[in-house]
């Protein structure tokens, strides 16, 4: 009997893939064209529909020297600021545990945090509305960095806010460091363990792990372009950066994470998810297109989605959740540059959504 049910599952997956045969062929061409135009060594693309993986392919290589092919189930990429969604989900879990109220002042949780001219809430910080500058003065991302958690309170005291909270959106990794400190205090552990225990382990996401400067065992390299050639990205220091970024993942584990968000009670309650993905507004009532750890907007074709992108030296990434269509798209690359990954996701999304309609 168990073989019969296994056969039905395989048959169902094959039928689903066949339903999207045209979209799959067009996606192959779109990705290949994008990869060739931008000289990207490796890309992983994974797509699910109604919680089923209908497309998962690797293009190119993870290492230009060894020619190791991209495997969407195994090849890990830097996901950069996509990590902010994991931090937001962790805060969402702490909200459900009555450990955090995002509408309260950050000073409620960090009593020793130096006072600024204006007060601001946890939600303001999560939506990049608090006026905090992008990165702390003195922090570097290369391996000459000496800035650490021990420096946070001193730098926060000396770094001025850019504007009155909620006046406008200003993207801030610095703010997510602050959120990480709140999580650590309310969770009672370091940020990566809190991510793991409250979110990642709930979905058995073993391939989403903290990044470090010692990833040689992965047989992965990350690239930038210099004088028209792909060269190795500089060493990345991840000290005190795991609330804002500095994770690696396979594209398929990002799909699992995304489906854990949209299907009820796998991770968080429906009302918690709605609170996190709802676009925030400025003092003047202008929608920012960003919730709490999630972009929340419409694509080029007018289809609503939420998700996050990520970019740093050696990576350009994005995932999108189209809730109305039950469609999830993840694209991870091992190169940074000025190419527009948004455009590729717009076109991939369009191909599948047109067939779903």
Label each region the model flagged.
Residues 22, 26-33, 42, 81, ...:
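Extracytoplasmic/secreted proteins, especially bacterial periplasmic and envelope-associated proteins
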Residues 34-44, 66-124, 163-174, 242-245, ...:
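Short active-site loop at a secondary-structure junction
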Residues 52-53, 99, 229, 327:
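Residue-level signal for well-ordered, solvent-exposed loop/turn and beta-edge residues enriched
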Residues 299, 335-357:
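Short, gly/Ser/Thr-rich active-site loops of penicillin-recognizing serine hydrolases
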Residues 59, 117-311:
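Short, surface-exposed loop or secondary-structure junction motifs
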Residues 239-248, 306-338:
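Glycine-rich phosphate/pyrophosphate-binding beta-alpha loops
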């Amino acid at each position: 009997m168990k073989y019969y049910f296994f056969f039905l599952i395989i048959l169902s997956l094959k039928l689903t893939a066949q339903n999207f045969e045209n979209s799959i062929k067009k996606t192959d061409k779109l990705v290949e064209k994008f990869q060739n135009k931008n000289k990207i060594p490796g890309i992983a693309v994974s797509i699910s529909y109604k919680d089923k993986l209908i497309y998962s392919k690797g293009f190119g290589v993870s290492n230009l020297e060894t020619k190791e092919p991209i495997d969407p189930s195994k090849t890990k990429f830097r996901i950069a600021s996509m990590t902010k969604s994991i931090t937001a989900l962790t805060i969402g879990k702490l909200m459900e545990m009555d450990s955090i109220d995002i509408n309260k002042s950050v000073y409620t949780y960090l009593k020793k945090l130096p006072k600024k001219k204006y007060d601001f809430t946890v939600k303001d910080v999560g939506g990049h509305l608090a006026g905090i500058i992008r990165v702390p003065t003195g922090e570097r991302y290369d391996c000459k960095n000496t800035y650490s958690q021990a420096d946070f309170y001193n730098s926060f005291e000396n770094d001025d806010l850019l504007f009155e909270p909620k006046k406008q959106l200003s993207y801030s990794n610095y703010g997510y460091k602050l959120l990480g400190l709140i999580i650590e205090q309310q969770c009672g552990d370091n940020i990566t363990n809190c991510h793991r225990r409250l979110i990642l382990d709930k979905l058995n996401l073993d391939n989403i792990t903290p990044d470090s400067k010692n990833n040689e065992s992965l047989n992965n390299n990350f690239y930038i372009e210099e004088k028209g050639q792909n060269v190795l990205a500089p060493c990345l220091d991840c000290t005190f950066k795991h609330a804002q970024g500095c994770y690696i993942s396979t594209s398929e584990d990002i799909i699992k994470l995304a489906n854990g968000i949209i299907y009820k009670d796998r991770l968080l309650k429906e009302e918690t998810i709605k609170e996190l993905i709802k676009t925030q507004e400025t003092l003047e009532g202008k929608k920012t297109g960003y919730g709490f750890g999630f972009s929340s907007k419409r694509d080029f074709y007018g289809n609503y989605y939420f998700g996050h992108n990520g970019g740093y030296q050696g990576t350009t990434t994005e995932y999108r959740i189209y809730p109305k269509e039950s469609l999830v798209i993840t694209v991870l690359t091992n190169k940074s540059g000025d190419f527009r990954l948004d455009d590729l996701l717009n076109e991939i999304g369009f191909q599948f959504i047109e067939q779903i309609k």
